[in-house]
Swiss-Prot record:
<dbReference type="GO" id="GO:0005813">
    <property type="term" value="C:centrosome"/>
</dbReference>
<dbReference type="GO" id="GO:0005524">
    <property type="term" value="F:ATP binding"/>
</dbReference>
<dbReference type="GO" id="GO:0005938">
    <property type="term" value="C:cell cortex"/>
</dbReference>
<dbReference type="InterPro" id="IPR004001">
    <property type="entry name" value="Actin_CS"/>
</dbReference>
<dbReference type="InterPro" id="IPR043129">
    <property type="entry name" value="ATPase_NBD"/>
</dbReference>
<dbReference type="GO" id="GO:0005875">
    <property type="term" value="C:microtubule associated complex"/>
</dbReference>
<keyword id="KW-0206">Cytoskeleton</keyword>
<dbReference type="GO" id="GO:0016192">
    <property type="term" value="P:vesicle-mediated transport"/>
</dbReference>
<dbReference type="GO" id="GO:0005829">
    <property type="term" value="C:cytosol"/>
</dbReference>
<dbReference type="GO" id="GO:0070062">
    <property type="term" value="C:extracellular exosome"/>
</dbReference>
<keyword id="KW-0007">Acetylation</keyword>
<comment type="subunit">
    <text>Part of the ACTR1A/ACTB filament around which the dynactin complex is built. The filament contains 8 copies of ACTR1A and 1 ACTB. Interacts with dynein and adapters such as BICD2. Interacts with BCCIP (isoform 2/alpha).</text>
</comment>
<protein>
    <recommendedName>
        <fullName>Alpha-centractin</fullName>
    </recommendedName>
</protein>
<keyword id="KW-0067">ATP-binding</keyword>
<keyword id="KW-0547">Nucleotide-binding</keyword>
<feature type="modified residue" description="N-acetylmethionine">
    <location>
        <position position="1"/>
    </location>
</feature>
<dbReference type="InterPro" id="IPR020902">
    <property type="entry name" value="Actin/actin-like_CS"/>
</dbReference>
Length: 376
């Protein structure tokens, strides 16, 4: 009887992004906790008693003492590269600093980027069932949840975060696996590209903690130009950015050159599609009868769609590729930074969620295979 009681508890929703992890309980409006998905380790020698305790820092503490630490992201392009660090971060999510709960008492909804290696999902299931002893687990695709958050059942979600950009067409609640498009170019690549431009302008950010400053500059100062060729010829007004040490830097054309990468991956020698092509090709791979509806129901999601001017630029690029008389409507929800988590919170609080998850018993009987049966 006891295991049934546990399964009736409120599920925990973890949106496991490459850059930021968002966690909270199903039924909440917004995630309770959001923190960078990295682990910090001190890079200097302790010489004083009473020095900062601990060898590993995660969450707000890692952010606060960033300059002292060497920072590593366990995830790159939506795929976990370092499982030990990933496990530590998940452990921290349940700790007294965060959700203050025991993992064995709550079912879990975990998000994942589409077209991820099966191995990644199997290993995640293994960690949650065997290390954290969760009573039930469901691994859901990020884009589907973003659509839940908008209250629609039809649309094409363009989700661009820190590690992965993908477009998923969904019709009346059915996702079309054959139409999904994904490229591994997203926010972190823009940050790296911006760091390169800043280096050319004489500002050197080389350590892992200084990379976080570049990320902050990107979020504050960068924008997407509707006509980059024209902006190159104009004198761009420089933006001033205050660094943590009190000095300022002036950023010129790199403000729009760096995010341009999302539309033109060839700028860093990548042969993949631009973000606008990812969207249009996903629609074109869908059934002909559905395309018109999908073009008029484009939903943006993820932090890399928050650049100033992103929507206008996307619209102008999609217009060039779409059939002439098709109506294009792009919806950019205000809370799109969290829309995957919000969708997860909605889904996990529905009664039907119980039919979707894999219980610990099923996992023990069938092993990692069981996790693929319930996800596509």
């Amino acid at each position: 009887m006891e295991s049934y009681d546990v399964i009736a508890n409120q599920p925990v929703v973890i949106d496991n992004g490459s850059g930021v992890i968002k966690a909270g309980f199903a039924g909440d409006q917004i995630p309770k906790y959001c923190f960078p998905n990295y682990v910090g380790r001190p890079k200097h020698v302790r010489v004083m008693a009473g020095a900062l305790e601990g060898d590993i820092f995660i969450g707000p503490k890692a952010e606060e003492h960033r300059g002292l630490l060497s920072i590593r992201y366990p995830m790159e392009h939506g795929i976990v590269k370092d499982w030990n660090d990933m496990e530590r971060i998940w452990q921290y999510v349940y700790s007294k600093d965060q959700l203050q709960t025991f993992s064995e008492e709550h079912p879990v909804l975990l998000t994942e980027a589409p077209l991820n290696p099966r191995k990644n999902r199997e290993r995640a299931a293994e960690v949650f069932f065997e290390t954290f002893n969760v009573p039930a687990l469901f691994i859901s695709m990020q884009a589907v949840l973003s659509l839940y958050a908008t209250g629609r059942t039809t649309g094409v979600v363009l989700d661009s975060g820190d590690g992965v950009t993908h477009a998923v067409p969904i019709y009346e609640g059915f996702a079309m696996p054959h139409s999904i498009m994904r490229i591994d170019i997203a926010g972190r690549d823009v940050s790296r590209f911006l760091r390169l431009y800043l280096r050319k302008e004489g500002y050197d950010f080389h350590s892992s903690s200084e990379f976080e400053i570049v990320k902050a500059i990107k979020e504050r100062a960068c924008y997407l130009s509707i006509n980059p060729q024209k902006d190159e010829t104009l004198e761009t007004e420089k933006a001033q950015y205050y660094l943590p040490d009190g000095s300022t830097i002036e950023i010129g054309p790199s403000r729009f050159r760096a995010p341009e990468l999302l539309f033109r991956p060839d700028l860093i020698g990548e042969e993949s599609e631009g973000i606008h092509e990812v969207l249009v090709f996903a629609i074109q791979k869908s059934d002909m009868d559905l395309r018109r509806t999908l073009f008029s129901n484009i939903v943006l999601s993820g932090g890399s769609t928050l650049f100033k001017g992103f929507g206008d630029r996307l619209l102008s690029e999609v217009k060039k590729l779409a059939p002439k008389d098709v109506k294009i409507r792009i919806s950019a929800p205000q809370e799109r930074l969290y829309s995957t988590w919000i969708g997860g919170s909605i889904l996990a609080s529905l009664d039907t969620f119980k039919k979707m998850w894999v219980s610990k018993k099923e996992y023990e009987e069938d092993g990692a295979r069981s996790i693929h049966r319930k996800t596509f």
